[in-house]
């Protein structure tokens, strides 16, 4: 049988697709690799299942957009999470993420997380960095609930991808938005004030009347794949 679904996660060579009939685990046809196409979370696909129940992705439908890193497709908003305390904000990384948004018709939203434990100097520096950009800047706290209702309103009716350094609190925010997720939460290294990875793969969740995508934290973003002419 043939179905249409949306990739909600990919682990190794296996992809989980969400359909009106539930979830299916599929592999992608070899021709995608030959054509240099990699299925990513957010992709809408056609796939077939055999009598054994195993699925195979046969077509990736036209993408509205594609993020390089985090790898995701058909995104409406990119929630760029910065910490108001530790780890210190990586503005270079945030600016590269914003550049991806501008080139891909994605709305960037700046989330200043951990505002309940903010370092005032760090918080005000982050505000100053982006206050004249015209982008929405939302102070939030997964711990005391600051900004969570506004964040839910941002997600409603949209597909939102959360991105940023490790330990800035992406998974904590998602747990606050949808407590039933119970995503693992990382800790900050006492020695180097950097986060440890807890999210191992990107996953799309249907919550708050929309979709949100949790992604692994990272600190490097190579822009070499973007056409310099753009």
What do these predicted regions represent?
Residues 1-11:
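Structural detector for short beta-strands of small beta-barrel domains
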Residues 15-19, 26, 47:
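SH3/SH3-like beta-barrel fold
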Residues 93-96, 124-125:
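Charged helix-capping and loop-helix junction motifs
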Residues 170-186:
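A conserved segment at the C-terminal end of the G1
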Residues 13, 30, 36-53, 61-78, ...:
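Helix-rich effector regions associated with P-loop NTPase G domains
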């Amino acid at each position: 049988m043939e179905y249409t679904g949306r990739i909600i996660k990919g682990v190794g060579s296996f992809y989980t697709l969400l359909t009106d009939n539930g979830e299916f685990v599929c592999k992608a046809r070899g021709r995608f690799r030959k054509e240099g196409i990699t299925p990513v979370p957010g992709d809408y696909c056609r796939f077939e299942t055999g009598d054994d129940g195993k699925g195979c992705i046969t077509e990736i439908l036209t993408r509205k957009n594609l993020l390089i890193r985090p790898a995701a497709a058909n995104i409406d908003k990119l929630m760029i999470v910065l910490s108001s305390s530790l780890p210190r904000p990586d503005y270079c990384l945030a600016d590269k993420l914003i550049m991806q948004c501008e080139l891909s018709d994605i709305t960037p939203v700046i989330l200043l997380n951990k505002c309940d434990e903010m370092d005032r100097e760090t918080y005000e520096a982050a505000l100053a960095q982006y206050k004249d950009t015209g982008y929405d800047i939302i102070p939030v706290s997964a711990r005391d609930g600051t900004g969570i209702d506004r964040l839910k309103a941002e997600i409603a009716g949209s597909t939102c991808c959360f991105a940023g350094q490790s330990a800035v609190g992406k998974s904590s925010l998602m747990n606050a938005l949808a407590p039933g997720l119970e995503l693992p939460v990382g800790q900050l290294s006492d020695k180097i004030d950097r986060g440890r990875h807890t999210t191992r793969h990107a996953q799309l969740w249907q919550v708050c009347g929309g979709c949100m995508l949790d992604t692994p934290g990272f600190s490097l973003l190579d822009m070499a794949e973007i056409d310099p002419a753009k």
